[in-house]
Every structure is written in C-alpha cells, then in structure tokens.
C-alpha cells in the first residue's frame, strides 16, 4: 500500500496596522493595510524530528518454486540412472558369458585328444614368426621404419599439388576467368604464395612472359624424386 502522509496547514494571522504603527491611521482615509505573518514551522508533520509521520509500507510476495520443474528434473534423473544401470548390467552379463565360454573351451581342449591340442599350440606359436617374416620380405632399399609412411604421404601430396599448380598456370592464360568464385578462389589462394616465391627470383621476359612456374615445377619434381628414392 502507498504511504499516507498527513499534512497540516496553519491559517495566517491578520493584524491591523494600527496595532503596529498607529501614526498612519490619522493621515490617510484609506483602511490600514493588512500584514501577513507565517509560522516558522508551517509543516511540522514533515520535519525530521517527527519520523513517525512518514510511513512507508511495502509487501513482497514469497518466491515459490514451481513443482512442475522439480518433477521433470526428477523424472529425467531417474531415466538416466535407469539407462545407466541397464547398460552396466548388460556389460557385466557379456563379460561373465565370455569368461564362462573361455573356461569351457580351455577345459574342452585339455580333455580332448592330445593331437588337437598339439596342433593348436603349434599354429599359435608359428603365427607370430610367419607374420614378422612376411614383413621382412621386402625389395632391397626398402626402409622398414615409420618414416616410410610419412615419405609415401608426402609423395602423394606433392603429386596432387603439382596437378593443382598445373591447373592454376593453365587458367592464368585466360584473362576472363572469375577467380572470385569457388573453387577457383581456393586454387588461387593455394598456389599463388608458392608461385610468388619464384616470381621474385626470375623476372618476366620482355615484361610479358612469366617463366617462373617452370622453376616451381622443377623444384616440385626434385622433391618428389627424393621422396620416391627414400621409400624405395
């Protein structure tokens, strides 16, 4: 509710002029002027000394949490816990079944004829050496190291980049090619930094013929031959 403030006004007091200065009454025929006096404290109800006169009332409604949201959150948590429990149960059941099957298989091999057991042991013991022997049967000059895989990947990347560079050089002969469109803009952004390296080294012939792409292709071919020689 709004605050109710009481305001009190005092009526002014009129005093005749004869009470204060009677000498003006005999000289003029007009009625004496009236004087207005106001009290020193016209609004005592609003003074600081009377704080009880100003009242402020405020009401705040209590915050109520919606029951619907709590019910939804509990339902979601229950579904999550239920699904987690079901997955854990299935995983435990699968592990138990595989363990039982492995035990039964080992018992069956032990109780079977010794010929089958000896053949199984022989096949398992010779599988590893045969695998590593097949890895060693490589042509001469082959590097059986992790760097070989990296070298093969670099060689393939150089071949692809050489093809893209060839497309860029061939299309540069046509002046009306829209290089702002895709995929032409991607080709330009990929090849121009590499071509600019050689344009600064070899200037154009007669200021018209640019032969710097020939040097760029020669460098790519040299790198490709080096990588191919390292892979064997």
UniProtKB/Swiss-Prot annotation:
Q: Which UniProt keywords apply?
A: Chloroplast, Membrane, Plastid, Thylakoid, Transit peptide, Transmembrane, Transmembrane helix
Subcellular localization, as worded in the UniProt entry: Plastid, Chloroplast thylakoid membrane
Is this entry keyworded Transmembrane? yes
Instruction: Quote the transit peptide annotation as a residue range.
Output: 1-16
Q: Where are the transmembrane segments?
A: 147-167, 201-221
**A GO BP annotation:** chloroplast fission
Instruction: Tell me the membrane topology, using the record's own terms.
Output: Multi-pass membrane protein
- Keyword RNA-binding on this protein? no
Q: Do you know which InterPro entries this protein is assigned to? A: CCB3/YggT
A single Gene Ontology CC term? chloroplast
| PANTHER family documented for this protein | YLMG HOMOLOG PROTEIN 1-1, CHLOROPLASTIC, YLMG HOMOLOG PROTEIN 2, CHLOROPLASTIC
Any other comment in the entry? Plant over-expressing YLMG1-1 have impaired chloroplast division leading to reduced number and enlarged chloroplasts in mesophyll cells. Plants silencing YLMG1-1 show a pale green phenotype in young emerging leaves and the basal part of expanding leaves.
Q: What does this protein do?
A: Required for the proper distribution of nucleoids in chloroplasts. The nucleoid partitioning by YLMG1-1 may be related to chloroplast division processes.
Q: Which family does it belong to?
A: Belongs to the YggT family.
The name on file for this protein is YlmG homolog protein 1-1, chloroplastic
Q: Which organism is this entry from?
A: Arabidopsis thaliana (Mouse-ear cress)
């Amino acid at each position: 509710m709004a605050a109710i403030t009481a305001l009190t006004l005092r009526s002014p007091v009129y005093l005749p002029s004869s009470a204060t200065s009677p000498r003006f009454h005999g000289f003029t025929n007009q009625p004496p002027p009236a004087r207005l006096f106001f009290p020193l404290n016209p609004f005592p109800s609003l003074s600081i000394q009377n704080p009880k006169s100003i009242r402020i009332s405020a009401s705040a409604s209590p915050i109520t949490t919606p029951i619907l949201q709590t019910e939804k959150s509990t339902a979601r948590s229950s579904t999550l816990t239920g699904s987690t429990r079901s997955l854990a149960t299935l995983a435990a059941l699968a592990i138990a079944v595989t363990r039982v099957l492995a035990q039964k298989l080992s018992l069956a091999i032990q109780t079977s004829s010794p010929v089958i057991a000896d053949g199984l042991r022989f096949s398992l013991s010779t599988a590893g050496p045969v695998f590593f022997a097949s890895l060693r049967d490589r042509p001469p000059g082959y590097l059986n190291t992790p760097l070989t895989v990296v070298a093969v990947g670099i060689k393939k990347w150089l071949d692809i980049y050489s093809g893209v560079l060839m497309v860029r050089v061939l299309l540069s002969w046509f002046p009306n090619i829209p290089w702002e469109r895709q995929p032409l803009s991607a080709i330009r952004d990929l090849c121009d930094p590499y071509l600019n390296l050689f344009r600064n080294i070899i200037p154009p012939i007669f200021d018209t013929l640019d032969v710097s792409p020939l040097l760029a292709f020669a460098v790519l071919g040299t790198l490709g031959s080096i990588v191919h020689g390292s892979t064997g």
